[in-house]
C-alpha cells in the first residue's frame, strides 16, 4: 500500500535546500493494495492516492525514482505498467529482478542530471 506508507512517513522526508539534494527511492511490486476487515485499499482509489503522495514528495523538491520489480517480462503497454506510470510519472522505471544493475544505472543518471 505505497500511498499509505508514503503518507505515514512524509514528515520524515528532508526537503531540498541550498546545501542538500534529496532523493526518494521506492521499490515496488507494481500495485498499491491492502485488504483488511472492513477496509480495502486498491484499484483506482489507491492509484490516485499514491500519485497524490508522490506529487507531495516532489513538491518538497525531492526527486523520486520508483522501480516496478518483477520476475516476469514487463510489457510497457500492460495495464499494470500503465497504472505504475500514472502513479509515479517520470520517476517510474520497470526493472527485471534478474538485472538489478538497472537500478544503479538509473540512479546514476538521476544524480548526474543535477
Model-derived features: where do they sit?
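Acidic, glycine-rich A-domain
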Residues: 1-114
